[in-house]
A protein has these predicted regions:
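Central helical "cap/lid" subdomain
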Residues: 78-132, 192-195
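Short beta-strand to alpha-helix junction loop
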Residues: 3-7, 24-49, 169-181
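Catalytic phosphate/metal-binding cores of nucleic-acid and nucleotide-processing enzymes, i.e., regions
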Residues: 26, 62, 200
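Generic structural signal for small/hydrophobic residues in well-ordered secondary structure
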Residues: 4, 48, 85-87, 121, ...
Length: 209
């Protein structure tokens, strides 16, 4: 996500606490109710995780309901838990829960996700434009001047996301080919010549939304 919004009063109280702790801030360029993590989007998650014993980069491949608890299994035994929250793309959720909740798995499998190619750009100097966000322009679904977000520093960096249709049509491209094809699309969308690149890379999110 490029940003998050706050509408529920309980969430608003939490975001106010994050703001006081310096891990969230408003991002006016995206609108009056847009917020981002600072210095990165994962800062609020890191702040919450600091209060708990969290296992990162742990692959869970199976769930078992046993004696009123949940047994998680991956490369080894991941432990027993009172509850499981599944926050995965529908395709992956269906595979994970099928043995314990086939009806839920069927519903998840019927909701395919759309892919997204994302390109990360850094330039040697600022792009001569006052635009910080580009929406729905040709193959570009969303482009953000990442340096316009609070806490990001002064570097001229952009994150460019292709539309779902373009991403699906070019799903199996190599990352460098996807980046190379989207760069001129971004230049056309921004409406001005781009300065020299310092960095260009791409990542494919197969299950983006």
């Amino acid at each position: 996500a490029q940003y998050f919004t706050v509408r529920d009063p309980r969430f608003a109280a939490q975001v106010a606490a994050w703001q006081s702790a310096g891990v969230a801030a408003r991002w006016p360029a995206a609108g009056p109710d847009a917020w981002v993590g600072t210095p990165g989007m994962n800062a609020p998650v890191k702040a919450m995780a600091a209060r708990h014993a969290v296992s990162w980069q742990t692959r869970i491949e199976a769930l078992e309901a046993r004696n009123g608890a949940w047994q998680l299994r991956g490369a080894g035994d991941a432990g027993r838990f009172d509850a499981v929250v599944v926050a995965l793309p529908a395709e992956q959720a269906a595979e994970l829960v099928r043995s314990v909740h086939p009806r839920f798995a069927d519903r998840a499998a019927a909701l395919p996700s759309a892919p997204c190619w994302t390109v990360m750009l850094a330039f040697s100097e600022p792009i001569p434009t006052d635009r910080h966000i580009v929406r729905e322009a040709g193959a570009i679904g969303w482009a953000t001047r990442d340096g316009s977000k609070p806490g990001r520093g002064d570097a001229e960096t952009w994150v460019v996301q292709a539309t779902p249709a373009w991403s699906a049509a070019h799903l199996e491209l190599a990352p460098e080919d996807a980046a190379g094809r989207l760069l001129p699309q971004f230049e056309a969308a921004i409406g001005t010549a781009l300065p020299p690149l310092c960095h260009l890379s791409a990542h494919r999110w197969r299950y983006a939304r």
